[in-house]
């Protein structure tokens, strides 16, 4: 397992800037206003792959000319995310500066075009993770490292737990950032108070229209009238996500899709980063060291919000977390990045010769 370093110590002891107190501000401000990249906005080239069920997934590859022997960083996005989410662009910047290959596979329906099959995506979709990583492994000669953000991280660790030792055939190391590894705890938290008013409303604003478009593709797939009345993610999952993807109801979906009960089965280096002030994830639901086994490293700083982790002077930047997580993944794969003494003000880099 990778040992402690400057970057890991920084993240484990992370403190938000004084001008961004509290988990909600540390979540909302970075997503909307903080600087995402040290360089230009990343450019992508898109590939469309046919899936085993006759559908398609769209993958956005960073448009940099890099040898296939360099490490490949794969990012699985969060709920309603994409390659243009703030964290996706921040990780793309890390890859661009480190001359890494980088790709964001979009979950079904998240690339800007509705998928065709009578399904969407969900938090426990480890089969989709496995299909994508296996295809990338066929294409790429160098090591593959993968990070999942929020929903994508739960699915990624769920895949790693499901595969056990065989996961190492496809990936050298994996990481989950602010992932609701106990879906029931996270689902109930986001359905209460401020979270319900702000975050639930934001998610349903795009999720309900997409579900209705899916119903138009496949009439009768779910109870359309009930979906129109859904007021929170519990209802949405009960009416759409669970039955469409083979679960009995919301409770069954949350229980079977959660990665937390499977963390002890992971047999490749894995990192789970969660702030204890994440508005979406109760701190008392986070995994404890005795629950995860020797292959899983836990970073649980007191600050950071949900996929925030802002740093620096106003208006702040969000590159420190992606650089620290990428550094951990590289070290777990036997590659030592270069971290200057001025980091995170100055960027982490990756040696040209590997």
Question: Can you name each region flagged by the protein language model?
Answer:
Residues 2-9, 140-245:
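Alpha/beta-hydrolase-fold enzymes
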Residues 23-66, 310-312, 316:
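N-terminal cap/lid segment of alpha/beta-hydrolase-fold proteins
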Residues 51, 62-116, 131-135:
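Short, surface-exposed "cap/lid" segments of acyl-processing enzymes
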Residues 119-139, 158:
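Alpha/beta-hydrolase active-site loop
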Residues 239-262:
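Active-site nucleophile elbow and catalytic-triad environment of alpha/beta-hydrolase enzymes
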Residues 266, 272-274, 278:
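Short beta-strand/loop motif that positions the catalytic acidic residue
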Residues 276-297, 301:
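Conserved loop-alpha-helix segment in the C-terminal half of the alpha/beta-hydrolase fold
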Residues 302-354:
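Catalytic active-site module of serine/aspartate enzymes centered on a nucleophile-bearing elbow/loop
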